[in-house]
Amino acid sequence: MAGKKVCIVGSGNWGSAIAKIVGSNASQLAHFDPRVTMWVFEEDIGGRKLTEIINTQHENVKYLPGHKLPPNVVAVPDVVQAATGADILVFVVPHQFIGKICDQLKGHLKANTIGISLIKGIDEGPNGLKLISEVIGESLGIPMSVLMGANIASEVAEEKFCETTIGCKDPAQGQLLKELMQTPNFRITVVQEVDTVEICGALKNIVAVGAGFCDGLGFGDNTKAAVIRLGLMEMIAFAKLFCSGSVSSATFLESCGVADLITTCYGGRNRKVAEAFARTGKSIEQLEKEMLNGQKLQGPQTARELHSILQHKGLVDKFPLFTAVYKVCYEGQPVGEFICCLQNHPEHM
């Protein structure tokens, strides 16, 4: 029987780190096709195409420099061509681009394709919250799983030990995806609460912006710990309000929950840029250009989408930390007033 074909949709920092793992595993495991395609948004790097550089030097020199990709990972600049014939699609692009990509892929996938989203973010639907995996699943008519965890891309690429969580409703699919992605240093737990796993991945970026504000304002470790805890409480409260399936507190103790929250609040780009925002007074857009090579920050954008949903439901007051991050990023509230928003938190009433 032919091995299952895998396509990675996306090739940024995290997409390239995952390509390293998937490419290596696919080349060694009999039930996967060794050739892994990776859709690359074509860019010009010093007069050469990025796809050409990846396919000859086996390195994403722009988004994951210094790390060799397996030679069986093939960069393809056309997303439809990359996904043609794929049995498994791994989605790992900034969440604001997913709608357009799904529109391009519609009608071009083979029957029985499955997808897994590594995208941290949420979307607004007509009835409020829309998870990215739902957007993809409904658009393409494929079953979707998610992978979220304490996974800073550069550390995963360096093969430093970490854990992650796959949310998958179908145990057989969950096992297949685990085989494709697990390594001795990238350990995977599979749970069935897909919605909760994905909500964790999106909301922790908002909390990390708050943690970055604390660092930029020099508030110290106790304050930052309080921000992280209050953020976790808001994440759980939000999940219980908005997830259609069951929400157990145990899922928040998996890598996708508390572990991802901790690593993002101490090491991630949302924290780093938010700290610079509090220190320098420069805009988020300017700091993205200066610090992230033009890549987009997920935290502020997710805060904006969330705020719109909470407003719609009349629940803004129940989520003061999420609301404070939104107001500082988009409504010109002074960052120095961030802590005032937490002094009357519902948790303390």
UniProtKB/Swiss-Prot annotation:
Write out the residues that bind NAD(+): 10-15, 153, 269, 296, 298
Q: Where does substrate bind?
A: 120, 269-270
Q: How does it assemble?
A: Homodimer.
- Which cellular compartments is it found in? Cytoplasm
Protein name (database record): Glycerol-3-phosphate dehydrogenase [NAD(+)], cytoplasmic
Which family would the database say this protein is a member of? Belongs to the NAD-dependent glycerol-3-phosphate dehydrogenase family.
Keyword entries, A-Z: Cytoplasm, NAD, Oxidoreductase, Phosphoprotein
Q: Cite the GO molecular-function annotations of the record.
A: glycerol-3-phosphate dehydrogenase (NAD+) activity; glycerol-3-phosphate dehydrogenase (quinone) activity; NAD binding; protein homodimerization activity
What reaction does this enzyme carry out catalytically? Answer: sn-glycerol 3-phosphate + NAD(+) = dihydroxyacetone phosphate + NADH + H(+)
Q: Where is the active site?
A: 204 (proton acceptor)
Task: Name the GO terms of the biological process aspect.
Answer: cellular response to cAMP; cellular response to tumor necrosis factor; gluconeogenesis; glycerol-3-phosphate catabolic process; glycerol-3-phosphate metabolic process; glycerol-3-phosphate shuttle; glycerolipid metabolic process; NADH metabolic process
- Gene Ontology CC: one annotated term: cytosol
Q: Name one Pfam family in it.
A: NAD_Gly3P_dh_C
List modified residues, type Phosphotyrosine. Answer: 326
The family database entries (InterPro entries) matched by this protein are listed as: 6-PGluconate_DH-like_C_sf, 6PGD_dom2, G3P_DH_NAD-dep, G3P_DH_NAD-dep_C, G3P_DH_NAD-dep_euk, G3P_DH_NAD-dep_N, NAD(P)-bd_dom_sf
Q: N6-succinyllysine modification sites? A: 289
**Which EC main class describes this enzyme?**
oxidoreductase
Taxonomy of origin reads:
Eukaryota, Metazoa, Chordata, Craniata, Vertebrata
The free-text function statement in the UniProt record for this protein reads: Has glycerol-3-phosphate dehydrogenase activity.
Q: EC number(s)?
A: 1.1.1.8
Which residues does this entry mark as bearing Phosphoserine? Answer: 154
Which PANTHER family does the entry link to?
A: GLYCEROL-3-PHOSPHATE DEHYDROGENASE, GLYCEROL-3-PHOSPHATE DEHYDROGENASE [NAD(+)], CYTOPLASMIC
